[in-house]
Amino acid sequence: MASNSWNASSSPGEGREDGQDGMDKSLDNDAEGVWSPDIEQSFQEALAIYPPCGRRKIILSDEGKMYGRNELIARYIKLRTGKTRTKKQVSSHLQVLARREISGDSSKLKAMNLDQVSKDKAFQSMASMSSAQIVSASVLQNKLSPPPPLPQAVFSAAPRFWSGPIPGQPGPSQDIKPFAQPAYPIQPPMPPSLASYEPLAPLPPAASAVPVWQDRTIASAKLRLLEYSAFMEVPRDAETYSKHLFVHIGQTNPSYSDPLLEAMDIRQIYDKFPEKKGGLKELYERGPQNSFFLLKFWADLNSTIQDGPGTFYGVSSQYSSAENMTITVSTKVCSFGKQVVEKVETEYARLENSRFVYRIHRSPMCEYMINFIHKLKHLPEKYMMNSVLENFTILQVVTNRDTQETLLCIAFVFEVSTSEHGAQHHVYKLVKD
């Protein structure tokens, strides 16, 4: 790896995903897939208790552990009935119920005297919801009030782009606001005459489908971010050291059933990043526009490790691609929308498991960043830290060195974590509507 040093600008806790207490082992001799009335009742209760949360984890305050929603539903069924249902069975049951909801609502829509535009809007709203959201919307609606007329009965609202705060975290900064997705008018198609009728073209082969990680993780058509961390290491003796993660993103294995990333209007954050040549606005207009993401970190500053001689502050990141390229990674630290320092690193590909991997390992932080962290940690109140962080951003741009094509552009914004379980994050896809 070839890298340059930081250059000043001329401008001024991990939750387990794979089961709990042997949940995926024995099924207590219950027939797999059989949902008796007591299990179904507990399942419905759990749906109302644990709302859909996408790929986020839910922290149980009494245990301090993080669980996925399906895992919590399975635990609830076990506690209420003594019968075991795995999180995979819960997921399958959600999908079955979702298909029933869609089928039932489709029949009701046909029976009602709705115009074509209303039908299309209802199905469009239905298509944008995950199976968990479809089922939960129905459960909560039945519990709270008699269902109003369709199509609002089950689909009272399309999923919001800006979700609620992560448990244990303050709400999002007021200067980054959600935007409403405009309703696109759908014109009913004109029925073709028999003379012009042609059979539909065959579906494209599965091999040409969009990769599962695209639109669900920080990934463009050509490059995917696998890991990212900023950390501090303090040596304890000649062979060991203590490590603290300020921010961290670990590798994930998304599936097609996972929700797509929420969208954020890029114009809301233009003023937080440089506007001159090579700034965020110019980069987005140049495209490709599926390469732009907003990454909000709740940074963990609650370190008990004492800074001292030999302390190392660094950043590590890892990317993967189906193409063999040489990439250039530009990292710009910005204050009040102005670039303060920039570091440019060049990384070459290594073939691993039929994909090309790019690793930037233990890249040293610049002095500006180290001093900034020190001053931030000495502020007496969290709200003071967040006030400072409102004007602090980082812009990372990954390009193909040979073609200068933008492969990934990640805009970082920050708040201070109030959780006892370390750093957390949320990813948004930057769009312009």
Curated annotation (Swiss-Prot):
Location of this chain's protein in the cell: Nucleus
Domain of life: Eukaryota
Tissues expressed in: High levels in cardiac muscle, low in skeletal muscle. Intermediate levels in gizzard and lung, low levels in kidney.
InterPro entries reported in the protein's UniProt record: TEA/ATTS_dom (IPR000818), TEA/ATTS_sf (IPR038096), TEC1_TEAD_TF (IPR050937), TEF-5 (IPR027253), TEF_metazoa (IPR016361), YBD (IPR041086)
Region feature (Transcriptional activation): 171-433
Pfam families: TEA, YBD
Matching Gene3D superfamilies: 2.70.50.80, TEA/ATTS domain
Positions of the DNA-binding region: 28-104
Region (Disordered) residue spans: 1-35
Compositionally biased residues, Polar residues: 1-12
Major location category of this protein: nucleus
Function: Transcription factor which plays a key role in the Hippo signaling pathway, a pathway involved in organ size control and tumor suppression by restricting proliferation and promoting apoptosis. The core of this pathway is composed of a kinase cascade wherein MST1/MST2, in complex with its regulatory protein SAV1, phosphorylates and activates LATS1/2 in complex with its regulatory protein MOB1, which in turn phosphorylates and inactivates YAP1 oncoprotein and WWTR1/TAZ.
Name listed for the protein in its UniProt record: Transcriptional enhancer factor TEF-5
Gene expressing this chain: TEAD3
